Amino acid sequence: MPVLRLPKFGKPVKYAYITGRVRAMKTKLIPNEMYARMLNMDIPEIARYLEETQYKEEIDALAKDYSGAELIEHATFANLAKTYRKLLEVSIDEPQFLILEYLRRWDIWNIKTILRGKFYGASDSEIMKYIVPAGELDQEFLEGLAKKDSINDVITAFEGTDFAEALSKYDGKSLASVENALDKLYYFRMERAVGGTLSVGGGLLLKYVKREIDIRNLITLFRMNKAGIEASIVQENLIPGGKLSEELSRMAGQPYADFVRGLEGYPFWSAISDVATADLDSVSRIEARLKAYLIRYAWSLSNYHPLSILPVLGYIVTKETEVANIRKIVRGKEAGLPNELIEEQMVVA
């Protein structure tokens, strides 16, 4: 497995080609207004609608083996992986490097998915349903991991790699510490690699990533402060490297009402001010609002830098959100949830 690279691109990078490709790909995204219509469809109707979109190839190919919600889940993840691989294929030099560094989050997703599957005794075929080979770890390698007999066997497969230290946190009782360590590893590697390029493109991506870290930490604070978890434990779960890391760390363990009042005035406050109340029952609506804010932030940055990595990043996060929304709708319908409950968990930017 390759070690972390730190290239220093010395020449101006031409982003016209990759941003042009992304503009064309963006036109194929599902319009936001379609989500409301999908909420009023049954699962077979949703599948038929998706056959008329960029998901047609995957729906048709997988229909012989799956049906219903399972078909849609497989098809959307397969399409997501294909789309991200296409971005890597049509990019070169700095754009390709930055895209790959960002997409390494899917390596983390896949490792977590395999560990969880082994922890709960899932079969390798069940685990592979949720694998998205969109990062550096390829399908064959991931299938090999899914076939391992135990969590320890999976961990052993990463000896000598950047993942080894994070995976060593596994205590045999819970996956929480190792998952937290993997998340921190991703952002540490990301900041080190992207910051190491010393390029304008790397700097722009780093600016977004710092905001992403802040939003992830904010969601963690909402969940843990709402649950009354003590400050030291909350702080252990926060990811370093955000622009607001020190300020958010000081909010760990605060009484929930005080914590919410302390958020007023921050850039993200307007996105959540009407739902971040002291009597909040569920954090899911706040999480959806914050993720939508992050997408808008990515696109707003790209407006100032149209020939940069940012339009590509905006597309990447929007595409991921599209797949997540489709899956939430389908899972919710399969579980018989009311539309209102499904809708509040969806991210619409």
UniProtKB/Swiss-Prot annotation:
Presence of keyword Membrane: yes
InterPro entries xrefs: ATPase_csu/dsu_sf, ATPase_V0-cplx_csu, ATPase_V0-cplx_csu/dsu, V-ATPase_V0D/AC39_subunit, V-type_ATPase_csu/dsu, V-type_ATPase_csu/dsu_dom_3
Location, primary (coarse class): membrane
Any one GO biological process: proton motive force-driven plasma membrane ATP synthesis
Pfam families, per the entry: vATP-synt_AC39 (PF01992)
GO cellular component entries: plasma membrane; proton-transporting V-type ATPase, V0 domain
Protein localization: Cell membrane
UniProt keywords, alphabetically: ATP synthesis, Cell membrane, Hydrogen ion transport, Ion transport, Membrane, Transport
One annotated GO molecular function: proton-transporting ATP synthase activity, rotational mechanism
Highest taxon listed in the record's lineage: Archaea
Membrane topology, record value: Peripheral membrane protein
NCBIfam families assigned: AhaC, PRK01198.1-4
Subunit structure: Has multiple subunits with at least A(3), B(3), C, D, E, F, H, I and proteolipid K(x).
Protein family per UniProt: Belongs to the V-ATPase V0D/AC39 subunit family.
Function noted in UniProt: Component of the A-type ATP synthase that produces ATP from ADP in the presence of a proton gradient across the membrane.
Name assigned to this protein: A-type ATP synthase subunit C
Gene: atpC
